A protein has these predicted regions:
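Bacterial N-terminal signal peptides
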Residues: 7-16
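Solvent-exposed helix/loop surface patches that form functional interfaces
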Residues: 31, 81-195
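N-terminal helix-cap/turn-to-beta initiation motif at the start of protein domains
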Residues: 19-21
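Positively charged n-region of N-terminal signal peptides that target proteins for export
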Residues: 1-5
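N-terminal mature ectodomain segment of secretory-pathway/periplasmic proteins
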Residues: 23-100
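Intrinsically disordered, low-complexity segments enriched in small/polar residues
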Residues: 7, 24, 49, 67, ...
């Protein structure tokens, strides 16, 4: 356990310094204009995988608004053990979700509300940026705290349907990673375009 904690700490330090095992960088596009950047990182050692997703965008929502997003997900033996997701609006915490496996179940805390889940989570939103979900029919959203449906549309193209509001995100893959992600959002739709 001590070695696991040390590994996770080192992963977070490495992620903070930009030393990722696998990385991706995307432009965030709204209305045809670049408004920010989205970065992805994955590092693995033995049977432990750590994913980190980060973004920062400035959009006009009646006034100029800067939105930052941070997600860290830790898997051990292909099972989610812990994730932390925080979104900030103009520097103030806007939403927070934590998921933690302990004593045979997950405790999910979203904005102060707690739920539990008994079955192991093996595929999450963070993993979508590093592996094509071939044969997968649902994905756990670390930010929402629940499962969303995945549908394969055609070769290398998938839809993720939000179980709460039925918004649809489209993922287009090339060589196992998404090159384009179109996201339907209640405030505005946006697109992630891979640029490396």
């Amino acid at each position: 356990m001590k070695n696991f904690v040390l590994f996770v700490y080192l992963c977070i330090v490495c992620f903070g310094s930009g030393a990722f095992g696998q990385t991706g960088k995307y432009d965030i596009i709204v209305g045809g204009h670049k408004v920010g950047e989205f970065t992805t990182g994955k590092i693995e050692k033995g049977d432990t995988i750590v994913y980190k997703l980060q973004s920062k965008a400035s959009v006009h929502l009646f006034v100029e608004t800067t939105i930052t997003y941070h997600l860290t997900s830790i898997y051990v033996k292909e099972k989610l053990i812990e994730s932390t997701n925080k979104t900030y609006k103009n520097g103030d915490l806007h939403s927070s979700t934590t998921v933690k496996w302990s004593n045979g179940q997950y405790t999910i805390i979203k904005n102060g509300h707690t739920t539990t889940l008994d079955s192991p989570i093996t595929f999450t939103s963070a993993a979508l940026y590093f592996s094509e979900p071939s044969g997968v029919n649902r994905v756990f959203s670390e930010s929402a705290g629940f499962y969303n449906k995945i549908e394969k549309n055609d070769t290398d193209n998938y839809s993720v349907i939000n179980a709460d509001n039925h918004h649809v995100s489209h993922y287009t893959y090339e060589d196992g990673t998404p090159t384009k992600v179109e996201i339907e959002h209640h405030l505005f739709d946006f697109t992630l375009m891979k640029n490396n």
